[in-house]
């Protein structure tokens, strides 16, 4: 089990910059905007041969009573509960702030091991940096620069020493970490993605706030359901330009697309109370282009009239007909209805994406399809399909060999896809078909 280090501090002291350095990633969005990190955000890091999990938190304001600031404070408190060691980050350039004292008072009461890190200390004498912060009563401050890396490795090494001293059992299996099936939950803003995550894992792990754009970053959550391991990827909602900060918008879209590429199965969440938009179709198109297994969840289904339900079904058939391979579930994430069936489809889609297709059966299905309907003649000769084998998985790829296959019509490719899907029960995954024309051994060479 890997030790857990939580990064805590008031807004804009450099928590996300330190998180990104520790995890060698750009997983946490970084910009000079207080409150940018709103959820607990997890990443993996390593110092020497010792791996650990880092938690980036939103700006901590313990006395906040309402609104999203209070939700961020709640997330930070949960991160502290999960952590073996807390690194409390303060700003060396701005000096000690009243809010730092409030946070220090809270942390002392938690019983967690606390390390005090004075960030943005590059170019400053240690005595000048540390003097202000001794009064917090948290021991000797560590002077660091998260942006440049100064002092960071020593700080984390000390945190790990504390963690292993506190819990020796951590050393027994530090590298054991089974992520299970990776599920990306994607969709436009405010369709219920975070509510679905919370329903699946049974705790308020991701803020589900009635405000579009609350979840700005991709968040990875390991959990088990019926004894099976999964990792949920809750992504920033894709949205039209102009509704959020431009820099964040561009990066969030990229993060969502990267999360789709990182997943085994994508759950596309649609809002039953809104029409299917071009944006929904674009997200769906990227999922298919990425070759990812897919399950569709139509959320907020409870309370809709029969007419409204018929309307959304017709809208889906018209605008998302290219997703006919995916199972559709009508759910209420808030009321937690339909989620069990959706997860069964996730398992089935993953199994279909990873299926092994024996060459003899593939070839037999191909020959039966050709016998039922031959491809149309193209030019002088009719295409001759000879045999098929599997060329890959996730998604499954069927490679068909033969002669004169360069002009196989798209309609015939779809016909073959349907035959293969039916024969192997491939529901929930895209299926790729590649045609390869055999070289004629009697053709004369120009050499």
Curated annotation (Swiss-Prot):
Q: Which branch of life, at top level? A: Bacteria
Q: Could you tell me which residue ranges the EngA-type G domain spans? A: 3-167, 181-354
SUPFAM superfamilies, per the entry: P-loop containing nucleoside triphosphate hydrolases
Q: Where does GTP 1 bind?
A: 9-16, 56-60, 119-122
What keywords were assigned to this record? GTP-binding, Nucleotide-binding, Repeat, Ribosome biogenesis
Tell me which Gene Ontology terms the entry assigns under biological process: ribosome biogenesis
One MF term in the entry's GO annotations: ribosome binding
Binding-site residues, GTP 2? 187-194, 234-238, 299-302
| Residues in KH-like domain copies | 355-439
Question: InterPro entries recorded for this chain?
Answer: AAA+_ATPase, G_ENGA, GTP-bd, GTPase_Der, KH_dom-like, KH_dom-like_a/b, P-loop_NTPase, Small_GTP-bd
UniProt lists the family membership as follows: Belongs to the TRAFAC class TrmE-Era-EngA-EngB-Septin-like GTPase superfamily. EngA (Der) GTPase family.
Q: What does this protein do?
A: GTPase that plays an essential role in the late steps of ribosome biogenesis.
Relate the assembly described in the record.
Associates with the 50S ribosomal subunit.
| Protein's name according to its UniProt entry | GTPase Der
